[in-house]
């Protein structure tokens, strides 16, 4: 199977049969598990997060709670005790951020609400924590972010992030 974007899988293990997911130039091989893959083209990394069971990326076996991140240069880093709730928040109808920069926040908002985001003076260095329902209107999301110190101008479907 090949994906673009993000997907969540629950796979039952079958002897002598492997379930493989290709995302960009990487392949995740399932060994009977539940896992999330985030591989949007605009993200700097492909992230595979294990909810339960095990998967194999390259020659590394990942276990529940692990997250493998492969950057655009092909370097892989494995994080143990990953924030599974954050990784699968999208499938539970939420945006969840834990020390996320504005670019991380705005990439998700841009995809969900189909808006174009720009940073004419560069992205602010502020970090964001919290969860926002994906059922909130775009105006509601910006109101929440502005209460956290973010500044924007909005013209139609174009959002300009200000310092």
Place the predicted regions along the sequence by residue:
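A residue-level detector for the "anchor" residue at the start of short, highly conserved motifs
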Residues: 1-163
């Amino acid at each position: 199977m090949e994906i673009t974007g993000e997907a969540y899988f629950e796979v039952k293990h079958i002897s002598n049969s492997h379930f493989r997911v290709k995302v960009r130039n990487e392949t995740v091989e399932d060994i009977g598990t539940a896992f999330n893959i985030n591989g949007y083209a605009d993200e700097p990394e492909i992230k595979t997060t294990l909810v339960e069971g095990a998967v194999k990326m390259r020659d590394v076996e990942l276990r529940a709670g692990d997250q493998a991140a492969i950057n655009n240069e092909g370097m892989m880093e494995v994080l143990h005790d990953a924030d599974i709730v954050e990784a699968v928040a999208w499938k539970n109808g939420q945006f969840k951020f834990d020390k996320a920069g504005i670019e991380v926040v705005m990439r998700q908002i841009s995809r969900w609400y189909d808006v174009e985001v720009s940073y004419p003076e560069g992205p602010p260095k502020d970090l964001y924590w919290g969860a926002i329902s994906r059922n909130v209107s775009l105006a509601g999301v910006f109101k929440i972010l502005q209460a956290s110190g973010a500044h924007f101008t909005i013209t139609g479907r174009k959002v300009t992030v200000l310092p």
